Amino acid sequence: MSAPAQPPAEGTEGAAPGGGPPGPPPNTTSNRRLQQTQAQVEEVVDIMRVNVDKVLERDQKLSELDDRADALQAGASVFESSAAKLKRKYWWKNCKMMIMLGAICAIIVVVIVIYIFT
């Protein structure tokens, strides 16, 4: 004779409804989600720290570049004024040379005229 069939015990811990394989307890799932979220938050925090460091480095480089640009502007201003002075100096030198050349030509013409008429 066979033993009477026993129905499956209901209310067993971890048993899925319908008699399927038992699922993870709900507390474990929420812990896993919490850990995943915390890992994502830590990753975002690390990325933001790197970004802040990069922004600070960029700010420092921009400050150095601004200082160099100011120094270059000052040098350009000095160069411009000295170039203008040099231009004026050689313009006057050229004028003096032209006056001397004109005077020499005038003297030569006067000498030739005097030589011809005497």
UniProtKB/Swiss-Prot annotation:
Gene Ontology terms: cellular component: cell surface; glutamatergic synapse; mitochondrial outer membrane; neuromuscular junction; plasma membrane; presynapse; SNARE complex; specific granule membrane
Signal peptide positions on this chain: none
InterPro entries: Synaptobrevin-like, Synaptobrevin/VAMP, V_SNARE_CC
Residue ranges occupied by any v-SNARE coiled-coil homology domain in the UniProt entry: 33-93
Residues with Phosphoserine modification: S63
Annotated disulfide bonds: none
Side Cytoplasmic, residues: 1-96
Keywords attached to this entry: Coiled coil, Cytoplasmic vesicle, Membrane, Mitochondrion, Mitochondrion outer membrane, Phosphoprotein, Synapse, Synaptosome, Transmembrane, Transmembrane helix
Cited function: Involved in the targeting and/or fusion of transport vesicles to their target membrane.
Protein name: Vesicle-associated membrane protein 1
Organism: Rattus norvegicus (Rat)
Gene: Vamp1
